[in-house]
């Protein structure tokens, strides 16, 4: 078997579309027209994810040299990596009654305020089968 054919980075760089599910019921979230609310995120093996992770890990290591990194800083770093790895989302994504444009800043805000979304995206980004076997 030629291991060169198993290129997780290339697959992760394409990303995976995650159809959002209600955090309590597991039902898919749909808009008024029956369309899924979906976010496309790069996999954790992607170049973007890896570069963002290195950057925030280095920053935290420098900031908290001989101290334990606080959980809030770890969580913020995760949201930053995830926001940077968010490629697009469906046009039916809204927050506080207004359409939300897919930007790094909006993604970070959304993931911080609704961490259940971040959890679903993290799960998909970490599941190599979700982007390699699609």
Where are these regions (language model features)?
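Short, intrinsically disordered N-terminal pre-domain segments
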Residues: 1-14
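Residues that cap or initiate secondary-structure elements
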Residues: 7, 24-26, 45-47
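Short acidic, Pro/Gly- and aromatic-enriched capping/linker segments at domain boundaries
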Residues: 12-27
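Short, surface-exposed, charged amphipathic helix/loop patches that serve as local interaction elements
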Residues: 31-134
